[in-house]
């Protein structure tokens, strides 16, 4: 071998299992979903999980102390019984049809089992649901041939394996959504710094100021950002989305998942475009 001859080494870092998320979403989601109790956080979460072609995944991992929530129960028992996203979403949207004469929802596990027995569904999404951080596998232990999605729902106890999902998860074919009641309660040096998608319900001024300082200030002034937040949050249960690394400002800031900045406030959109 000639030591003077340069080596021609080509390393392929391409993920053979690239996620096919919906247009205008990052190729791989590392999301923060922030909002106080009863703000409506479950609405975008279950929309992301259950609307077809929204997020691309076939293995779901949920860490939550609220697994008894009926939507979680439907997802857990639904996927375990091979129901599809559409099947589970239909249950949620038609909940009244599955209630007893007393107005009580039929047992969800029995509901899913009965539906599966009658229809022989062909859903292929697998699921793991746990209520303690130590039961979550390290991302290195995930099957990288799967398209993994992990939900961390109001986890008060921080563990290294949770943090690793935001620092290493994308290298192990895993997307993540971290749910918290406060932006400032999310660990900064690890999870906050590595997120690329923020879903923000009405926040207190401290959180708004910090998000502007850490993410938004290169695009608009603090006053403009406050105005944008107020325009979105003027109705209950509405939320602002920031697609952190989207270079198209019209789609970087959205009212909900799909309403772009230009449709929220054209004057603000024109102003910040003049500055860029």
Please name every model-derived segment.
Residues 79-93:
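Acidic, Ser/Thr-rich peripheral helices and adjacent loops at domain boundaries
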Residues 60:
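An amphipathic, basic-hydrophobic helix/alpha-beta surface used to engage anionic
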Residues 17-19, 29-55, 65-76, 94-223:
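Conserved P-loop NTPase motor cores
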Residues 1-20, 67, 79:
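N-terminal pre-Walker A segment at the start of P-loop NTPase domains
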Residues 19-35, 55, 146, 197, ...:
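P-loop NTPase motor core of the ASCE superfamily
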């Amino acid at each position: 071998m000639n030591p003077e001859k340069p080596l021609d080494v080509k390393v392929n870092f391409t993920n053979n299992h690239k996620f096919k998320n919906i247009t205008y979403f990052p190729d791989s989601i590392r999301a923060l979903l922030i909002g106080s109790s009863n703000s409506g956080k479950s609405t975008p979460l279950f929309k992301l999980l259950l609307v077809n072609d929204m997020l691309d995944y076939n293995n779901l991992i949920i860490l939550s102390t609220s697994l008894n929530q009926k939507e979680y129960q439907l997802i857990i028992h639904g996927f375990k019984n091979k129901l599809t996203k559409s099947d589970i979403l239909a249950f949620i949207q038609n909940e009244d049809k599955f209630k007893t004469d007393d107005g009580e929802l039929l047992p969800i596990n029995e509901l899913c089992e009965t539906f599966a027995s009658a229809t022989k569904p062909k859903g292929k999404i697998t699921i793991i649901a746990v209520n303690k951080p130590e039961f979550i596998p390290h991302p290195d232990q995930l099957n990288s041939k799967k398209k993994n999605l992990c939900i961390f729902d109001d986890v008060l106890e921080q563990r290294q394996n949770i943090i690793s999902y935001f620092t290493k998860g994308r290298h192990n074919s895993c997307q993540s959504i971290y749910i918290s009641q406060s932006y400032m309660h999310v660990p900064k040096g690890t999870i906050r710094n590595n997120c690329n998608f923020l879903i923000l319900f009405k926040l207190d001024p401290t959180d708004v100021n910090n998000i502007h300082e850490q993410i938004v200030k290169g695009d608009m002034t603090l006053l403009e950002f406050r105005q944008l937040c107020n325009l979105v949050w003027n109705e209950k249960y509405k939320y602002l989305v920031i697609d952190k690394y989207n270079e198209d400002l019209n789609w970087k800031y959205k009212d909900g998942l799909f309403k772009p900045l230009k449709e929220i406030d054209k004057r603000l959109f024109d102003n910040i475009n003049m500055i860029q």
